[in-house]
Amino acid sequence: MNNKNIEIVTDSAAETIELGERIGTSLKGGEVFALIGNLGTGKTHLIKGISLGLGAHDPDQVSSPTFVLVNEYFGREGLIHIYHIDAYRIDSVGEFEALGFEEYCRPDSVVLVEWADKVLPVLDGVECIQLQLEHVSETQRKIVVQNAPAYLTVS
């Protein structure tokens, strides 16, 4: 991992999805992403793009698992498991650990955690690629990538 911050501004939801797709295409498996941002900043759009880049068959099925907490998608001919975790409704770090977070972190999976700021103590022990999303305007989003591996494609 490197500690360089990379800033990208997207001008629409479609561009945010395209950015996610570029990121997903470059992944090898074993990555954990911590997505942080307020409501409506594009976390789920970015995850939809990452899933598409990983070869998910139906990216339209990608939705925020706010009530079920974890969605699983399959990419690259079933070889990559994509775990989409939404920590928005999680009340404690213990509840997050009880989801089996560590079991999802495998070489054949990519783990994407929305609202990761709520569970940072658990993520501190894991090498995470952090994606911080912010509103710039009604349509623009600033995405700051931290701790990205050298092979990660963001531009």
Regions found by a protein language model. Give the residues of each.
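Switch I (G2) and immediately adjacent beta-strands of P-loop GTPase domains
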Residues: 67-91
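Post-Walker A helix-loop "phosphate-sensing" segment adjacent to the P-loop in P-loop NTPases
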Residues: 52-61
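Short phosphate-coordinating micro-motif centered on Lys-Gly-acidic
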Residues: 4-6, 91-155
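Conserved lysine of the Walker
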Residues: 43
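Phosphate-binding P-loop
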Residues: 24-29
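Hydrophobic anchor at the beta1->P-loop junction of P-loop NTPases
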Residues: 33-35
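N-terminal pre-Walker A segment at the start of P-loop NTPase domains
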Residues: 2-20
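The conserved Walker
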Residues: 39
